[in-house]
Amino acid sequence: MTANASREPSTAVLSDIAPDSGRKLTSTEKWRFGVGFVLFSLIWMVAGTSGSAVLLPQRFTELNIGMPEVILGTMNSVGCVFALFSNVIFGALSDITRSRFGKRTPWIVAGGLITAAGYVLAFSSAQLVGIVAGWCIVQVGVNMMIAPAVAVLSDRIPENVRGTFSAFYGGAQIVGSSAGTFLGSKFIENMGTGFAIGAALFAVTGIVTVLIWPRERSSAASVASVESSDATAKLDVKQLLRSFIPPTKNCRDFYLALMGRLLLILGWNMISGYQLYILQKYCGLSVKDSAATISTMSVISMVVLIVTSMVSGPLSDRLQRRKVIVAIGSVIIAIGVAIPCFMPNALGMMLFAGIGGAGYGIYIAVDQALNVDVLPSQEE
């Protein structure tokens, strides 16, 4: 058992002190953080999923510039590469950012605006190159928001309620995903309006979040320890490059969590990311029936996700257990994902939404807290 794994046993006492302030959070601060995490995940996921799961796939079909499945796969594949590097880069840059607004806030706000710009480009382009370029900008902007926002969990949230706030973040993310597919299905025949709503939601995500959260402390004072702007630049490059070096000490649980999340998200998105095409080409539904089925699936998954995520997060804090809850959620997801293989119809997809959604709510509500707990270095 590694040192970072020692956080999980029931004998451990999780701290109730906020790392950034060295004191307990007030009730008002807890509510502000909770609402901020919920709205952050909810808003950007509604915008992103309405486009990526419904509107863009349908637009690819109507553009008639190639096989829509190939276009969607190309967009997602290239976008994943940009997302991976952007998350690491902007996470590292936010760690060393010095401003009177703090080190996370500027990136969260700027990320939302950049995401909106990329979303407009992806929708307005009628060629594959423009679509992919726009989506890559979306991934850069989204991760410019996500990396610093998730870091707030370890920066400012006490250990003893981290599972609860992870539930706020994760639960709202999945509810936002369901709400996004529902929204997209309602604009499948009026895509211009749907994309305009999505772009507006992206633009306000970061602004709304930082206005609701308790104001981040200024990080500008740290500049005094740096002798010159040249030294600052060298420090930035050195720390940025160090961010790409995989950890080698006290990292067993970190890599287990990383691989587990990678495999689970891969399996989940093989269904949820292509659900419009699955309904149309695997289940044989029309565009209208596919939209109606997606709406129903969204409502089903939204209900079960709210219930399971809001229960599993606080439960993990009370039990001081993360791994067992994540494992249970993963098994339930696997059962849900398997159903459409044996029931290639609308009912099978609805059962996937209900059973798989319940498991995903359990998993995602606790997974982020687990990832923070098993970091080899809590300061990075």
Question: Language-model segments: what does each one mean?
Answer:
Residues R104-V120, V324-I339:
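Structural signature of the two symmetry-related core transmembrane helices
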